[in-house]
Regions:
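Extracellular lectin-like interaction modules
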Residues: 7-11, 64
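Catalytic beta/alpha-barrel core
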Residues: 14, 18-33, 47-56, 73-84
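Glycine-enriched alpha-helix->loop->beta-strand junction motifs that scaffold or abut catalytic
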Residues: 19-23, 38-48, 68-74, 98-102, ...
């Protein structure tokens, strides 16, 4: 998500990861387009992602459609809400995309406001959630223990 490296270094890192034959590899689409283009043969293992640590952009639906059209295994978006309605908008956009294009979308709103989005996949169709083992790797991330507890209650 939030890493500042040259395009050459980014591609080098991704190629190194692929030598370990991971189930999936996360590739930033809008900030590292050339790396995505160089790895198109690995679409079936690719989580095509978009991170925005500042806002929920008004063109998010269009971005998701563009990413979906690339034909990767999953499309992931992580955005920073400024208001409660930003979280609700993300939940609705995720649901709309899932109903229209299938169940390969992953979405989350970051920060304290976004915590609901991390556990509401059963409502929106977001097919993954992310939890921390010890230290949070993203703003608003919930621990694995808390995530399991909450999801267990919600799935009863």
């Amino acid at each position: 998500g939030n890493i500042q490296v040259s395009e050459k270094k980014y591609l080098q890192i991704l190629k190194e990861i692929l030598t370990y034959n991971p189930a999936y590899i996360d590739v930033e689409f809008f900030t590292h387009g050339p790396s995505f283009a160089a790895l198109k043969d690995f679409r079936d293992k690719m989580v095509l992602s978009y991170h925005n640590f500042d806002e929920v952009p008004t063109d998010l639906t269009n971005r998701l459609i563009k990413m979906h059209e690339e034909g990767t295994a999953f499309v992931k978006v992580a955005v920073m809400p400024e208001r409660e309605c930003d979280v609700l908008d993300l939940l609705q956009i995720t649901r709309d995309m899932t109903l229209e294009y299938g169940d390969h979308f992953i979405s989350m709103a970051m920060g304290d406001l976004g915590r609901l989005s991390r556990i509401s996949g059963y409502l929106t169709g977001s097919c993954w959630t992310f939890a921390s083992l010890e230290n949070s790797s993203a703003p608003g991330q919930i621990s694995l223990k808390e995530t399991e507890y909450i999801l267990d209650i919600l799935e009863k």
